[in-house]
Swiss-Prot record:
Stated name of the protein: NAD(P)H-quinone oxidoreductase subunit H, chloroplastic
CC terms in the record's Gene Ontology section: chloroplast thylakoid membrane
Main location: plastid
Keywords: Chloroplast, Membrane, NAD, NADP, Plastid, Plastoquinone, Quinone, Thylakoid, Translocase, Transport
Subcellular localization(s) per the UniProt record: Plastid, Chloroplast thylakoid membrane
EC numbers: 7.1.1.-
Membrane topology: Peripheral membrane protein
Amino acid sequence: MTVPATKKDLMIINMGPHHPSMHGVLRLIVTLDGEDVIDCEPILGYLHRGMEKIAENRTIIQYLPYVTRWDYLATMFTEAITVNAPEQLGNIQVPKRASYIRVIMLELSRIASHLLWLGPFMADIGAQTPFFYIFRERELLYDLFEAATGMRMMHNYFRIGGVAADLPHGWIDKCLDFCDYSLTGVVEYQKLITRNPIFLERVEEVGIIGGEEAINWGLSGPMLRASGIQWDLRKVDHYECYDEFDWEVQWQKEGDSLARYLVRISEMTESIKILQQALEGIPGGPYENLEVRRFDRAKDSEWNDFEYRFISKKPSPTFELLKQELYVRVEAPKGELGIFLIGDNSVFPWRWKIRPPGFINLQILPQLVKRMKLADIMTILGSIDIIMGEVDR
């Protein structure tokens, strides 16, 4: 008896929502033909908190604690972009010392983000040990953050015109010690991981993105630089004082998951180079432009009234955002983090549009995983490096 040939049944499975400690609450609906991926649909929004709408009825200083919840592994960058936008809108000068402190904090935050990408990425592809190794450097980093800002993660350290506090006594020496120790740590990771045959089998020629394709998808950060495009906003936009340091843009031309790993590992070394130069050359002077904090009381005769001071809710003294629109961007660890700000001659922004790198980089995932094996999904997803706090906002 002959059995009639039937169309092979496809299997639809749910991957996720993943645990928040790994890639955040991302859900993937995957269509499989055996082990081969036919289709993949990411489901977003589980961590949506209305961050853009919240910004519209907060002053910039009131809004600063919220922004650290976007990319909660690299909070200095979300703070930097939040204060950079009104600074550029109001043409506010930042003292040289404050600019150096900002660069130091940003590069420390970049190293912390890449470390906490490396651990879960290796765990995704089956290597559990590096997940525990990266916590050594991470703990030292968070000790430095805690000494300077008072907080280990949600720092709330940047201010319009500078930073909240100067570096404490002895902090620079401790940070230089960390740089020396961290360099040996990066060399150790490269010895353990980069030439490991099992690791190479999992990542080489997996999730390849060409240079033109990366530009067409609007990718940024290590995703773009791993595809042969030498584009780094620290070199392109010349913000803060990055031009005063000697460092190179790290890039690879292969465009696969291995190339993205190599770019991030190399970026950690470059960040340490920038840190060492900034720490050794940091100038004296004020850490904040205090002129910004002056409040024009002549306009507001009610400012000293009893009702205003003791009864009604009063915002922190802040300046008006001019009736202009502006796009500001920084090179975050995951790519281009941007803010489109529209002022309305008010202390509140009229529109605060966030351009998160993770959200845009994630869009290419369904195309990358098609015709790959099921096990390759976690490799490719891990190599993209997403944090759902900034994806869902």
